[in-house]
From Swiss-Prot:
UniProt GO molecular function: mRNA binding; structural constituent of ribosome
Source taxonomy: Eukaryota, Viridiplantae, Streptophyta, Embryophyta, Tracheophyta
Gene3D superfamilies: 3.10.440.10
Domain of life (superkingdom): Eukaryota
Protein name listed in UniProt: Large ribosomal subunit protein eL31z
PROSITE patterns associated with the record: RIBOSOMAL_L31E (PS01144)
Source species: Arabidopsis thaliana (Mouse-ear cress)
Cysteine pairings via disulfide bonds: none
Pfam families: Ribosomal_L31e
Length: 119
């Protein structure tokens, strides 16, 4: 690896637990779900280093499942950095954020996991 390059140039998938309760504290009731989506985008941008962040429909449905005022306190997401196939794309990579399956034991102590691609 070259000095100063970083590891932002490879295709990778990771699972994270995002504490939305901490990020949405002191947020107006009627803005909680939209701000939760924005915070997930911001988290993926920081974790993967790509400006193009795409949120999956199932994740959006889960955030909005209890209405605008009641997004989940914590959510387990799978963030994948993928190569952009469009020729006219500004960015070489994009991030796709999907909802991950939650184990029966709960979310505590899971940490970050690197997922091996099946492709």
């Amino acid at each position: 690896m070259e000095k100063g390059k970083g590891r932002k140039e490879e295709v990778v998938t990771r699972e994270y637990t995002i504490n939305l309760h901490r990020r949405l504290h002191s947020c107006t009731f009627k803005k909680k779900a939209p701000n939760a989506i924005k915070e997930i985008r911001k988290f993926a941008l920081k974790a993967m280093g790509t400006k193009d962040v795409r949120v999956d429909v199932k994740l959006n449905k889960q955030i909005w499942s209890k209405g605008i005022r009641g997004p989940p306190r914590r959510i387990r997401v799978r963030v994948a950095r993928k190569r952009n196939d469009d020729e006219d794309a500004k960015e070489e990579f994009f991030s796709l954020v999907t909802v991950a399956e939650i184990p029966a034991e709960g979310l505590s102590g899971l940490g970050t996991k690197v997922i091996e691609e099946e492709e």
